[in-house]
Every structure is written in structure tokens, then in C-alpha cells.
Curated annotation (Swiss-Prot):
InterPro entries: LysR-type_TF, LysR_subst-bd, NodD_PBP2, Tscrpt_reg_HTH_LysR, WH-like_DNA-bd_sf, WH_DNA-bd_sf
Pfam families given in the database record: HTH_1, LysR_substrate
Source lineage: Bacteria, Pseudomonadati, Pseudomonadota, Alphaproteobacteria, Hyphomicrobiales
DNA-binding region coordinates: 23-42
SUPFAM superfamilies referenced in this protein's UniProt entry, alphabetically: Periplasmic binding protein-like II, Winged helix' DNA-binding domain
Role played: NodD regulates the expression of the nodABCFE genes which encode other nodulation proteins. NodD is also a negative regulator of its own expression. Binds flavonoids as inducers.
Keywords assigned: Activator, DNA-binding, Nodulation, Plasmid, Repressor, Transcription, Transcription regulation
Protein's name according to its UniProt entry: Nodulation protein D 2
Family statement: Belongs to the LysR transcriptional regulatory family.
Single GO MF annotation: DNA binding
Span of domain HTH lysR-type: 6-63
PROSITE patterns reported in the protein's UniProt record: HTH_LYSR (PS50931)
Amino acid sequence: MRFKGLDLNLLVALDALTTERNLTAAARSINLSQPAMSAAIGRLRDYFRDELFTMNGRELRLTPRAEGLASAVRETLLQVQCSIISWEPFNPSKSDRCFRIVLSDFMMLIYFNKIIERVAREAPAVSFELLPLDSDPYEMLSRGDVDFLIVPEFFLSGAHPSAKLFTEKFVCVACSTNVDLPSALTIEQYVSTGHVAAAFGRFLKPSVEGWFLLENGIQRRVEVVVQGFSLIPPVLRGTNRIANLPLRLVEHYESTFPLRIINLPLPLPVFTEAVQWPALHNADPGSIWFREILVEEASRMMSSNAPKIHGLLQQSGS
């Protein structure tokens, strides 16, 4: 099938090549043989009158022309998929759809497990692929590689629709066996005490509280950096270090790790967790159904599971 001289099948090949950046992987992703994919590259070069790709070992490097085409081609294919191919009534009880979702370990532990339980009852054949926060989840969102991104509202992209889920606050914690640490710290004590901090992605981007401290000119003595909040309690145990954690995660680990809340002379940030989805999925019935579940469960959690900070403060001797 040709449109203005372009074989439309070549757009699928071009999308695979710009996504995978590897000839073999691109061919495999669309069930083509490697010789057939090589032939497709030749035809693409002829049509666009550009080299499009150069080889660097096994990696395909995109020319500026190919870089410019990549997002336009992906958006076009997504529009076809969402508006034509996938447009049909969504029946949760019969659907076998797999939702790909990027979220933090914190959200998995204190929130998303409830989503999984509910979906198992209402849509038993629906499945999930849960992905960690990468260095650039927004590119995955724009390309339609993921269905949802669940992050603090602070980190949302302005290019896609979103919905608020719930608010959360950070608290400073220490191991309860650290008897030398007072129940309240001065700002000098806070910045000079060794910290365990969470970071995300290949480039170890700081979390919300990390950005908050940086923007307010507060330089901590970070001694240990871990990938995600859930690794902080076991690393903190038995040490003289402190850390900042979401309050609900502290409560989640209350019976597992000896944690106590430390009072600080500065307020740590309150933040809002939110969900974002590709703009092209905005009218997708399956996406709408799942978004409603996310918001409903967040509302239910907020009303029935208010943080129990007072008990943890009493453990700290305040």
C-alpha cells in the first residue's frame, strides 16, 4: 500500500529502527528477517534521500533527518492504533490487556498492590508490566511505550494529561537503636549527620525532598545513595545515619524495621502523587477505565488510611 509514493509498511520498519537502534533487534520486533530489514533501510534511504542511519559497531546512529522523523512516525502509528485499530468497547471482565506502568517502589508498596487486588477481581485476565523510574520516562510516555506514569506532581510533563492521586509528606527517620541521636535536631545537626538518600534512574536523579533541599540551599552529608526508598530502612538499620522517607512508607515498615521519627527545625515537603498518560490515550476506553480505578483507590486510601504519625513520634521520645 502506497501513499504519495511511500510504502506505508516502511513506516513500521522506520519506527522499529529508530526505537531499537539495532538492526537485528528492530527486525525481530516486527517479525522481519535481517535481510528484509536491510532492504527496507535501502528503500527508506531512497525515498527520503538521506542516509538515515550509520553503523557504530552494532548500534544504529540516527542522522538529523532520522531524528526528526522518529517522533512524527511514532505519533502517526500511535494515532492509527488508538483511533482505528484499538477503538472498540472495553469489557474489563473479558479483556486480556497488559498495562505498562512506570512507578516508584514507594508507590508499589503502599498503593499499587491495592490496584492489583481490585483488578484481579474485576478483570482477571488483565495483567501489568511495572517498570522502574528510568532516566527519561517522559520519552517512553511520548512514544506510547508505557500506558501510565505515576510520579509526584512536581515531575509531571506539561505535554500530556494527568490526574492527582493523593498527598504525602516526608519525615526524617533514624534507627530506633541509635540512642545517641536526640529526638529533635538543629539544622546544623541535620546537615552534618550522615544521610542515606534515594535516587532514581541511570543518572541517580534526586527525589522530591532532594530537589527541595537543593532549591533551599541545604547541603546534606549524603553517605549512602540507594535506588529507591524501599532500600533505605535496611541500610539505615543499626547505623547512626538518618534519612528522609514518605510517612506512609515509614508506617509500612513500622513492624519490620526499628525506625523512629526525628523532629526537624525545617518542614520537609508535602507532595502530591499523580498519574499521567499519553495524550493519544485520552479517549481510549481501557485507559479511562483504569484511570478511574486509580483515582477511586487513591481517594479510598486517603479517607481510610490517614498517616499515624503520633505513634511513631511517641517512639522517638517526643
